C-alpha cells in the first residue's frame, strides 16, 4: 500500500512522524518497538528508493539515541542541575548509544537514513527531538510528559483533584519545542535539501 501511494503521488517531501514513542512500551514489548520504528522506517525508505528517489525524507528521531544522560557529570545548585562539561547545553557531539529498546530502534532507523543517502543518494534529513508539545497532544505520563504535567497541574487547582507524582526532585531542566515551530524547521530543511 505504501509503495503504491509513493509511486502514484511521487511526493516532494515525506515527513516520517510515525513511530512508537513510549519508553515503557519499548521495554514491555521490544518487538513492537523495533517493528514500528526500525522496520517501519525501512519500509518508507524502500518505497522512496524504488518509486520516488528524488523525494526529500525528513525523519522524526529522538534524543534517546545518545548515551544515557546518567553517565554525564552534574552539579546540583539551588534551583537546578547543571552540566559543567556542557555549559551551553547538549549537542550532537554526544556519543551514540541507544541505551534502551526505544533508543536502539530509533538509532537503527537513523543509520538506515544515513546509509540510504550514502548508497542510494536519497535526500534524507534526521531531527533528534526531545520534548514536544502542542495542540491535539494526547499526553500520558510516559509520552508527552509536558502536556501531562500541565494537565495535572491544572487539575490540582481544584482542591478535589487527586495528588500526582513528579519524577525526580523538580530540579531537572528540559527543553520543550512547540509542534508549530518544528514544522517551520522541517519546511526550511526541506527547502535546503
Language model regions located:
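NAD(P)H-binding glycine-rich loop region in Rossmannoid oxidoreductase-like domains
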Residues: 2-36, 65
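Conserved internal alpha-helix in NAD(P)-dependent oxidoreductase domains
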Residues: 12, 31, 35-42, 99, ...
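SDR active-site strand-loop-helix element
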Residues: 14-20, 57-62, 127-129
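Active-site segment of SDR-like NAD(P)-dependent oxidoreductases
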Residues: 20-24, 63-66, 96-99, 130-133
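Conserved catalytic-core motifs of eukaryotic protein kinase domains, centered on the activation segment
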Residues: 24-32, 55, 68-76, 138-139
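Conserved Rossmann-fold NAD(P)-dependent oxidoreductase catalytic core, especially the SDR/UDP-sugar
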Residues: 42-100
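NAD(P)-dependent short-chain dehydrogenase/reductase
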Residues: 70-87, 101, 111-190
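Active-site helix of classical SDR
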Residues: 105
Amino acid at each position: 500500500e505504501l509503495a503504491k501511494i509513493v509511486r502514484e503521488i511521487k511526493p516532494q517531501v515525506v515527513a516520517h512522524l510515525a513511530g512508537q514513542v513510549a519508553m515503557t512500551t519499548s521495554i514491555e514489548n521490544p518487538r513492537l518497538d523495533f517493528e514500528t520504528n526500525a522496520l517501519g522506517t525501512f519500509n518508507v525508505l524502500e518505497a522512496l528508493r524504488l518509486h520516488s528517489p528524488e523525494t526529500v525524507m525528513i525523519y522524526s528521531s529522538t534524543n534517546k539515541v545518545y548515551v544515557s544522560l546518567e553517565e554525564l557529570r552534574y552539579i546540583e545548585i539551588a534551583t537546578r542541575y547543571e552540566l559543567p562539561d556542557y555549559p551551553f547545553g547538549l549537542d550532537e557531539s554526544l556519543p551514540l548509544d541507544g541505551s534502551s529498546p526505544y533508543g536502539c530502534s530509533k538509532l537503527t532507523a537513523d543509520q538506515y537514513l544515513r546509509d540510504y543517502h550514502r548508497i542510494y543518494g536519497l535526500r534524507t534529513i534526521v531531527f533528534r527531538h526531545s520534548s514536544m508539545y502542542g495542540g491535539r497532544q494526547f499526553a500520558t505520563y510516559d509520552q508527552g510528559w509536558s502536556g501531562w504535567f500541565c494537565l495535572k497541574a491544572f487539575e490540582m487547582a481544584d482542591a478535589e483533584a487527586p495528588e500526582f507524582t513528579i519524577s525526580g526532585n523538580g530540579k531537572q531542566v528540559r527543553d520543550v519545542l512547540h509542534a508549530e515551530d518544528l514544522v517551520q524547521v522541517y519546511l526550511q530543511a526541506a527547502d535546503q535539501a
